[in-house]
């Protein structure tokens, strides 16, 4: 039986109603959730949290008013609001909110990040999140599961983002809408495991989860990724599924590098970048945003902030930063951005005329030194 099947106690294709252990959302999605909730319910019947991470501090009067509306709703219903402490998915992990949970519903498409903890975590639209808040349960169609087996050991310059750009590209012609991705034999650290599950959404997977020993049985397919031979990967505009070896785009001039987001803003990932930049100077605008205040604090304690500042990096407050193109380093017309985020759709980080390439923090940091996309092999 698949891991998802065990968590939901049902077979693929079945429609089930299950109790929700946690519902959370952020300042970007809460206004629509509030609107839907107020049409149907008057009481929150499950454990819930709200995080201000997408556009915080408020850069406009409109956003400030939306923040006020969210605070008022949260006060009425006794929902904790966490402001400016970091990205929702990271904070759910750090605050221990997913402990002993089986099913988590989030008002963000990257809620499956929490599958690295072994839970069934799924992002939903405003109406479904409102229903989960008001009923404390939700209906689900149990997805099929694809087993992804990681074989071998990654070379020192290979990170989880390389694995995921490769996997997403290999799945681009496959219908994944009601499929889950289950990873096994994962040699990466916990920080990097969160990247695997986070990035799986870009394969159009319903959710993702990480298991320990692969038992087989019940899976719709089995995919093996040979880590020993996997090259550094880059996703070209305008899709995470446009993955190529970094050699294919090496030398592409860039205007800005961004290291951070719910994909790659954790301590280990920023540390990898800082080690590369230590004692050097970046040759292009480079922004780093820690995923949480705890990551930021550890960066200070272990000297990463000094290294990055001395290298010419701009350090942003904990949160989503420029990932969604709302503030803190949006892309201008005809600019080329190299980002460690998970999306590079047209207009994602600002101007629809900008081009966004996706890569790992290692590739991004090396590229920042040269002002062009650079193969990290041979540089480390």
Curated annotation (Swiss-Prot):
Give the enzyme class.
Answer: lyase
* Enzyme Commission designation: 4.2.1.33
Involved pathway(s): Amino-acid biosynthesis; L-leucine biosynthesis; L-leucine from 3-methyl-2-oxobutanoate: step 2/4
Cite a single GO BP annotation. Answer: L-leucine biosynthetic process
Q: Give the Pfam families listed for this entry.
A: Aconitase
Check the record and name the PANTHER family matching this protein: HOMOACONITASE, MITOCHONDRIAL (PTHR43822:SF2), HOMOACONITASE, MITOCHONDRIAL-RELATED (PTHR43822)
Name-wise, this protein is 3-isopropylmalate dehydratase large subunit 2
Native species: Pyrococcus abyssi (strain GE5 / Orsay)
């Amino acid at each position: 039986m698949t891991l998802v099947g065990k968590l939901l106690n049902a077979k693929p294709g079945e429609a089930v109603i299950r109790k929700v252990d946690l519902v959370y959302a952020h300042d970007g999605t809460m206004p629509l959730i509030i609107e839907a909730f107020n049409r149907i319910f008057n009481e929150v019947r499950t454990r819930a949290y709200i995080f201000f991470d997408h556009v915080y501090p408020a850069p406009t009067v409109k956003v400030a008013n939306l923040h006020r509306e969210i605070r008022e709703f949260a006060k009425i219903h006794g929902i904790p609001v966490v402001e400016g402490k970091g990205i929702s998915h990271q904070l759910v992990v750090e605050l221990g909110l997913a402990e002993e949970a089986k099913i988590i519903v989030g008002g963000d498409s990257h809620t499956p990040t929490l599958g690295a903890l072994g839970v069934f975590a799924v992002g939903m639209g405003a109406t479904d999140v409102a229903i989960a808040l008001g009923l404390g349960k939700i209906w689900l169609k149990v997805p099929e599961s694809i087993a992804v087996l990681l074989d071998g050991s990654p070379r020192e310059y290979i990170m989880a983002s390389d694995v995921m750009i490769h996997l997403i590209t290999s799945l681009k012609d496959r219908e994944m809408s009601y499929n889950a991705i289950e990873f096994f034999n994962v040699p990466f650290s916990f920080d990097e495991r969160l990247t695997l599950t986070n990035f799986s959404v870009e394969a159009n997977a319903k959710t993702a989860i990480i298991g320990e020993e692969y038992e087989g049985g019940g899976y719709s397919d089995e995919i093996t990724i040979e880590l020993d031979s996997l090259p550094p990967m880059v996703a070209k505009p305008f899709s995470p599924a446009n993955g190529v070896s970094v050699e294919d785009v090496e030398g592409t001039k860039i205007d800005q590098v961004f290291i951070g987001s719910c994909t790659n803003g954790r301590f280990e990932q920023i540390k990898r970048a800082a080690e590369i930049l230590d004692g050097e100077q970046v040759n292009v605008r480079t922004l780093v945003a820690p995923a949480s205040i705890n990551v930021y604090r550890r960066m200070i304690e272990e000297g990463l902030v000094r290294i990055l500042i001395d290298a010419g990096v701009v350090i942003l407050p904990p949160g989503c930063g420029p990932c969604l193109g709302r503030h803190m380093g949006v892309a201008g017309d005809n600019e080329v951005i190299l980002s460690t985020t998970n999306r590079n759709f047209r207009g994602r980080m600002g101007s629809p005329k900008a081009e966004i390439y996706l890569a790992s923090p290692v590739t991004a940091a090396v590229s920042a030194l040269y002002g062009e996309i650079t193969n990290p092999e041979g540089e480390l």
